[in-house]
């Protein structure tokens, strides 16, 4: 197959950041995606309806002229989140609340330190139909970074899912065989997003031949057996798995430093890279489900009605992009050849 037409896709997990960075990130995503779930880990974090609504307005202001792109807003759960915060957020159009263990990712220091304290919040979310999005890693310093996702399932996620069977849960950016197996065997109220980097790469691509800072993200890339498990999961065509890029921009100097930031900025190449993965797996016909239908179906939202066409044609991802402030950012897969291209 050398051409495929999909219903317009959505991105069910990304980071736009804020300020002048929005002038880069919003158009990059609006290029192909109709909707996106916007992460709330700003400084300060987006913790309530008022902050979410204000952030949404800033995103809308950064859309290209004529764009109908729709940001889907989330709030950041903390130990101070109240039931009323959840009710108010839902009334304001917020679609989900995000659970970050404290210290698990960029700007997550304000996050949850005692999971059981949030159980009444999860109960309210289940009652009113707000989704729970989970960054699934434990964060104790003595636990090996490569083991943190599997331990989170065992200690925390299984408890949440068992205690609240009516709560819709998205296990975000899964990276392990254990996560793929957990989601597959869980109820229909549990799903997962998978990033392009975790389908394309494993930890050798981060560490062999030198440290590759632009492949560094959290959760960190795992060994090959986990990459293969994720590839096998999407190849099944299961509706439990859908597209979430976790596109996460950091300026070049913040990645290429003695203590580099975590995140891959994939918005400019993500759909094309997913197409490459599905083509390599011999299941390109299953890309539309992953990119365009499984996500809205799980969220209870209508599918998009437009289409995007991809053709099998090589192109090279730019080596860097200049941000509105004049600083460069290095996109994911910079300088690499991609085999699928959006038909203009």
Swiss-Prot record:
Domain of life: Bacteria
Pfam families: Amidohydro_1
A GO term for molecular function: dihydroorotase activity
InterPro entries: Amidohydro-rel, DHOdimr, Dihydroorotase_CS, Metal_Hydrolase
Annotated binding of substrate, by residue: 15-17, 41, 135, 218, 250, 262
Subunit-level organization: Homodimer.
UniProt-listed HAMAP family: PyrC_classII
Protein name: Dihydroorotase
């Amino acid at each position: 197959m050398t051409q495929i037409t999909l219903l317009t896709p959505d991105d069910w997990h990304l980071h736009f950041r804020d300020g002048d960075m929005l002038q880069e990130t919003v158009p990059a995503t609006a290029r192909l995606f109709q909707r996106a779930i916007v992460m709330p880990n700003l400084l300060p974090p987006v913790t309530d309806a008022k902050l979410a609504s204000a952030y949404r307005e800033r995103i809308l202001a950064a859309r290209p002229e004529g764009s109908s792109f729709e940001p889907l807003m989330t709030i950041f759960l903390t130990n101070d989140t109240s039931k009323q915060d959840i009710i108010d957020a839902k009334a304001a159009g917020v679609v989900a609340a995000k659970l970050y263990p404290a210290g698990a990712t960029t700007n997550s220091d304000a996050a949850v330190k005692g999971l059981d304290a949030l159980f009444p919040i999860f109960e309210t979310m289940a009652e009113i139909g707000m989704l729970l999005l989970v960054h699934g890693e434990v964060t104790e310093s003595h636990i090996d970074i490569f083991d943190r996702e599997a331990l989170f399932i065992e200690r925390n996620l299984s408890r949440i899912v068992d205690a609240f069977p009516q709560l819709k849960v998205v296990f975000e950016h899964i990276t392990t065989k254990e996560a793929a197996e957990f989601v597959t065997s869980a109820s229909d109220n549990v799903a997962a997003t998978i990033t392009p980097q975790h389908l394309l790469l494993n930890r050798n691509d981060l560490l062999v031949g030198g440290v590759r800072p632009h492949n560094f993200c959290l959760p960190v890339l795992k060994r090959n057996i986990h990459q293969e498990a994720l590839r096998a999961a999407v190849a099944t065509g299961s509706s439990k798995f859908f597209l979430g890029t976790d596109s996460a921009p950091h300026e070049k100097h913040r990645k290429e430093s003695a203590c580099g930031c975590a995140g891959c900025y994939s918005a400019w190449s993500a759909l094309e890279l997913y197409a490459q993965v599905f083509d390599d797996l011999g299941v390109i016909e299953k890309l539309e489900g992953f990119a365009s239908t499984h996500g809205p179906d799980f969220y209870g939202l209508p599918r998009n009605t437009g289409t995007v066409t991809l053709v099998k044609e090589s192109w090279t991802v730019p080596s860097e992009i200049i941000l509105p402030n004049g600083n460069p950012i290095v996109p994911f897969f910079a300088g690499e050849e991609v085999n699928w291209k959006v038909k203009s």
